Amino acid sequence: MLGSIACSMEFEDFDLYSYFYGLVKQIPEGYVTTYGDLAQALGDPIAARAVGYMLSINEDPDTIPCYRVVLHDGTVGNYTHPLGPMEKVRRLRADGIPVVDGMIENFDRYRFRDFKTDQPLRKMQQYQEYIARKYSESGAGEFRTVAAFDVSYEERRAFASMVIQDGSTIEAYVISDGINFPYIPGYLAFREFRFIKKLYRKADLLLIDGNGILHPRFAGLATHAGVLLDRASIGVAKHLTRSTRHQDIIYMQDRPVGVMIRKNMIVSPGNFIDVNGSADTVRKMWNDRYPWPLKLAHQLSTRHAETGGRVSEYSIESAHELH
């Protein structure tokens, strides 16, 4: 069984970019691998699209040989180089790999899969299963103070905001930092929780842009944050993940996990609250059909991302202007 403290610290600032580029460096000269093979080496096939993204932003192609990554059928595919696929073919042939009409001949002979890896995404799945077991649907008291969190991005930089509402008092905070984890469906907590933790101030309820138990392993960002910070939490998402729906109740594996309040607002409990309680709580915060603290947090993070962080602080008055 994974220890909660050890795993939390291991994954909190996990640099998946560096780990991934280390895998690419393992591909020997004279061999190729596929996007799917690299995703498997990371620990989950769902990471294949993220693999493509990380390859596309590789800033050191001479040291990190991304040209040795091809499509599943041996098609050479694209290459982020001024000369495009032509340069990729040239480099592959220089490695001794036969390429004819954009395809690698005898593909299986040149395919490399023997990565030395501890499959970090698989370990993260196990940790999420641990988090899910810690979720409680009861235990919350009165929500006097609400802290809403949102993260926006500009290239490989994140701008994370927190808005705390305590009655008529509003406080707003924004931080910025580099991103060390790409977007991979089901793993948002490992990308964004570290920002939430840095921003966190004691509050009765955490309102988070993301899912709670509406998650393949019942441990979305809101549940992850609620469990680790030991606070009641609710996730509010704009898009519905794979699930089934009966009227407005959302189910996963026959378990109620959320409520579709409207088309682009899906609410799920994160911690210390149940499905109906989370929906009722969010409805009480509606302003223009969206929970106001989270709307403001989104506006703050977005404005910082759009200006490259040149907006450095907000007064209560400017926060009201955004509202």
From Swiss-Prot:
Cofactor entry: Mg(2+)
Spans annotated as Probable methylated-DNA--protein-cysteine methyltransferase: 1-91
In its UniProt record, a GO molecular function of this protein is: methyltransferase activity
Chain spans, region Endonuclease V: 92-323
Can you state which reaction this protein catalyses?
Answer: Endonucleolytic cleavage at apurinic or apyrimidinic sites to products with a 5'-phosphate
Positions that bind Mg(2+): 150, 209
Instruction: From the record, give the transmembrane residue ranges.
Output: none
Q: Which InterPro entries match?
A: Endonuclease-V, MethylDNA_cys_MeTrfase_DNA-bd, MethylDNA_cys_MeTrfase_DNAb, WH-like_DNA-bd_sf
Site residues by UniProt (Interaction with target DNA): 183
- Show the GO cellular component annotation of the record: cytoplasm
Enumerate the subcellular locations listed in this protein's record, separating them with semicolons. Cytoplasm
**What processes does the entry annotate via GO biological process terms?**
DNA repair; methylation
Catalytic-site annotation from UniProt: 66
Keywords from UniProt, A to Z, are: Cytoplasm, DNA damage, DNA repair, Endonuclease, Hydrolase, Magnesium, Metal-binding, Methyltransferase, Multifunctional enzyme, Nuclease, Transferase
Which CDD domains does the entry link to? ATase, Endonuclease_V
EC numbers, comma separated: 2.1.1.-, 3.1.21.7
| Gene3D superfamilies hit by this protein | archaeoglobus fulgidus dsm 4304 superfamily, Winged helix-like DNA-binding domain superfamily/Winged helix DNA-binding domain
What does this protein do, in the record's words? DNA repair enzyme involved in the repair of deaminated bases. Selectively cleaves double-stranded DNA at the second phosphodiester bond 3' to a deoxyinosine leaving behind the intact lesion on the nicked DNA.
User: Which family would the database say this protein is a member of?
Assistant: In the N-terminal section; belongs to the MGMT family. In the C-terminal section; belongs to the endonuclease V family.
- NCBIfam families assigned: ogt
Supply the name of the protein: Bifunctional methyltransferase/endonuclease
This protein's species is: Thermoplasma acidophilum (strain ATCC 25905 / DSM 1728 / JCM 9062 / NBRC 15155 / AMRC-C165)
* Source lineage: Archaea, Methanobacteriati, Thermoplasmatota, Thermoplasmata, Thermoplasmatales
